[in-house]
Amino acid sequence: MTNKISRNGLTLMVNFSVIALCLALSLNMFVTGLPQKIFYLVSYLSVASILYGVARRRVDFKENGFYLALFAVLIIFALIRLFWAIHVKGIDTAPSTDAMTNIGNYLLGAKRLLLGAFVLLSLAIYGHRVSTTTLRIGRGLILVGLLITLGFGIHEHLYTENIRIKLTTEAASMSSYMILFIYCAWLWLSRFETHAYWKVADVVVLAVTFALLYLCGTRVTLIAMIAVGLLFLVQTYRLSLLTNWRISALLVGVLAVLILMTSNRWVEGMQDIENYGSNSSTSLGARVAIWGGAVNFIEHHGGGFATPDARTTEARQFIMAHYPLNVEGYTNVKYNMHNEFLEVTTLQGWLGTLSLALIYLTVLTGVLKKCDLRGVALPMLGLFIAGLTDSVMPYNQTATIFMMALALCCIRRPLPVRRVTTA
């Protein structure tokens, strides 16, 4: 009797956690504070569920080997960031305002990465207990949240000075990454649905996500959204994609529409490349200058721990020496290195680089060993693409949303007997 009550309680807790995470994702882009509190509650429940499973010997380490490995490397990644933030906070006696913001983001982000790793492991182990009703409620919350977010985004675009919407974040790029990760969670949860009306919801969410990313004006997230969507289609409908010309034609048509609707941003990018010799103070030129400053900093500091102010000072000296007219790069280098690996290496050294590489290597190893990680691949692909031209994880908001989406993408349960396909 006691065991039955425990199992029912565990099932209830896991289903509550999924709904709570979806609620947090749905609120995150227009409400501040509450989504983070929900995340903390779910993380504490997740820690308790894992301890319960270990104590009762109900954790199958062999079956969950990949997710245990992913949990371990995420813990290592978070601990290195946490140790760096505490260390730098102690030795930097007079940090600038930007440095304090940077350190604070890393410190809070590292704590949430640690807690998020437990949420991920809990849903990976107990995801089979999640009911179809729970998934439908969760997807409904995300759908409503995205629609409300679009309303706030349109209002901000029309009635404020922000041409690129920021919503609840400090930068448009941060908002776009968070929206991308929310879309990844939606895609994975849609895999377990059979009813045709949810396919209409899939189209609505695709359109809303695209509209939000368009309003954010971040090119790389549009590329990432297309890549993530293609990966999901290949995972889910690969036979139809190969054999059904109508689905293939529809896919090509959607891609063409997306490219045409964002053509102005691609034209700007091409103009930046063409005019780079005469005007390097552009979005592209700034990145080239910042990357050069980052590489120069790494070469001179041997890949050890460094303070944000030291990095900014030396990178600006490099930019002034090699790109004296690049005002954009000189200004923005104080925020981050606009590349995930360069960002980590310049601050946490080669130890930080290794911890980030371990996450990708773990996923790659799982792919080679044919582990069931199709859900995990979606946000990881989005993070990798976005991280090529920007720093995503230093900001505590994006790190939190990434971990929530990644955790939801770890849910594994039997696929429905009948799936909706196009004949």
How should each PLM-predicted stretch be described?
Residues 1-93, 124, 128-136, 191-200, ...:
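Transmembrane signal-anchor hairpin modules in multi-pass inner-membrane enzymes, especially those
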Residues 37-41, 219-231, 352-357:
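Transmembrane-embedded, aromatic-rich helix segments that form part
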Residues 66-82, 91-125, 140, 146, ...:
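Aromatic-anchored transmembrane helix interface
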Residues 115-161, 169-237, 261:
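Alpha-helical transmembrane segments of multi-pass inner-membrane proteins
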Residues 215, 236-278, 292-299:
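A membrane-periplasm/extracellular boundary helix in multi-pass inner-membrane enzymes
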Residues 243-246, 347-381:
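Hydrophobic transmembrane alpha-helices and their immediate junctions
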Residues 281-285, 305-348:
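Long extracytoplasmic/lumenal interhelical loops at the membrane interface
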Residues 359, 377-388, 392-423:
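Transmembrane alpha-helices of multi-pass inner-membrane enzymes
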